[in-house]
């Protein structure tokens, strides 16, 4: 799929879910804040309970850019963990390496963060990690491989070039962009994680399966 096609696909998905998944999609949603299709402007008919829960699950999955199987595994772990399942789920997903790379400003989008990880530009505590799903633990340091620091994507990041599209830095991260590094100082809490999702609806979706 070409870059143009991927952008168009993300924009269409953003409109369908009602959330911006990329900076370009955010601008598009400002102009057309309705679902794609010829009837997008008209008032939508009342969705069924199942449709509402399904859409909320899709919104969470899309914001982390993960497959259904990955989300289901995370949900099963969240259900086994003490506490509220929905909150546990978001907190588990937020510990993904690709999520923290974009959250810290080292990448502009989740897709770019995943690419940087897969191409072995990212290290955790001095060791290269090429799995976007890698679970970062509290206290661990995420940083750019020294040989990659001078490349254009990281020079842009070091200059704060993504600040215009990323949410405010959450307090569970300590970031030094000039050094291209970020530390997960503690585990995230759901209320701090900048994702749009009614997590209880996601719990209800899986509970009914």
UniProtKB/Swiss-Prot annotation:
The keyword Cell wall biogenesis/degradation does not apply. Keywords: Ribonucleoprotein, Ribosomal protein, RNA-binding, rRNA-binding. Residues 95-176 form the S4 RNA-binding domain. One of its GO terms (molecular function) is rRNA binding. Residues 1-20, 28-49 are annotated as: Disordered. It holds the Pfam family S4. GO terms for biological process: ribosomal small subunit biogenesis; translation. One of its GO terms (cellular component) is small ribosomal subunit. Residues 1-13 have a biased composition (Basic residues). The keyword Ribosomal protein applies. SUPFAM superfamilies: Alpha-L RNA-binding motif. Part of the 30S ribosomal subunit. Contacts protein S5. The interaction surface between S4 and S5 is involved in control of translational fidelity. Belongs to the universal ribosomal protein uS4 family. HAMAP family: Ribosomal_uS4_B (MF_01306_B). One of the primary rRNA binding proteins, it binds directly to 16S rRNA where it nucleates assembly of the body of the 30S subunit. This is Small ribosomal subunit protein uS4. It comes from Clavibacter michiganensis subsp. michiganensis (strain NCPPB 382). The gene is rpsD.
């Amino acid at each position: 799929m070409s870059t143009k096609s991927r952008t168009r696909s993300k924009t269409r998905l953003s409109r369908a879910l009602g959330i911006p998944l990329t900076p370009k999609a955010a601008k598009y949603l400002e102009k057309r804040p309705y679902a794609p299709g010829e009837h997008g402007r008209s008032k939508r008919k009342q969705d069924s309970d199942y449709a509402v829960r399904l859409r909320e699950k899709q919104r969470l999955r899309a914001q982390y850019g993960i497959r259904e199987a990955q989300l289901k595994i995370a949900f099963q772990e969240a259900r086994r963990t003490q506490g509220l399942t929905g909150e546990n789920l978001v907190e588990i997903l937020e510990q993904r390496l690709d999520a923290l790379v974009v959250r810290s400003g080292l990448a502009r989008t989740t897709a770019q963060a995943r690419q940087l990880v897969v191409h072995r530009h990212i290290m955790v505590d001095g060791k290269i990690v090429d799995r976007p799903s890698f679970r970062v633990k509290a206290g661990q340091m995420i940083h750019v491989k020294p040989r990659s620091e001078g490349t254009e994507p990281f020079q842009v990041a070091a200059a704060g070039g993504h600040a215009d599209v990323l949410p405010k830095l959450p307090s569970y991260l300590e970031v030094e962009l000039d050094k291209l590094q970020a530390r997960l100082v503690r585990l995230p809490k759901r209320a701090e994680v900048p994702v749009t999702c009614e997590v209880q609806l996601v719990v209800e979706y899986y509970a009914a399966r």
